[in-house]
Amino acid sequence: VVHGGGRAITRALNQAGIETRFEQGYRVTTPKSVEVVEQVLSREINPGIVGMINELGGKARGFSGTEIFHCKPFRPLGQTGEPLDIGLVGEVTGVNTAPLLECIAQDITPVISPTATGEDGQVYNCNADVAAGQAAVALRPKRLVYMSDVPGLLQNPDDPASVISHLPVAEVEALKAGGVISKGMIPKVDSAVTAVAAGVEKVFFIDGRFSHSLLLEIFTDAGVGTEIAEK
């Protein structure tokens, strides 16, 4: 499990009196704000998820992403085509799989926050969707599942009923060009495509608020979210 925590981070930064600024949809992360990010993700949200899994009869172990993910500074292109300096935001370049495989061998669920260690030893804030995709590339599971607060990839963002149930990888670029895949969905879908190219059979986008959505998506013919696959 790789989790996020954007809203909790924004609340914590506001409480600390630290301005939250976004460039091209990415949170600009300063040395002061990355301390809050790591605190919220790795020492508040992460133990909470681990605790809930354990309470429900599962076995889970928490990891700060700094123990698992390696990264380089991420510099998205601005409107003029120039790289934007958004501070301590990382692009995951490597995954330390040893502790994850050790957990899996013991039927323990690893729960990882989306932070990473840079080449400079600094803590970086990372996109959770991209981090999850890179974990899948490294571990090669059969399935990768993205759970969020939307029903799946929507043909019309304003219509929750317009879920695209199946999307072949070859059709992704056309949907980007048509504006169907936009904003925060772009890194999510790009990560899914990267995972499929690396050997993951299927990637699912499902609504985590909906009871049994994971079981219904994987084990029923109709499904309830979006499935991305090679064909």
Locations of regions flagged by a protein language model:
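Nucleotide/pyrophosphate-binding catalytic subdomain
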Residues: 1-209, 216, 220-222, 229-231
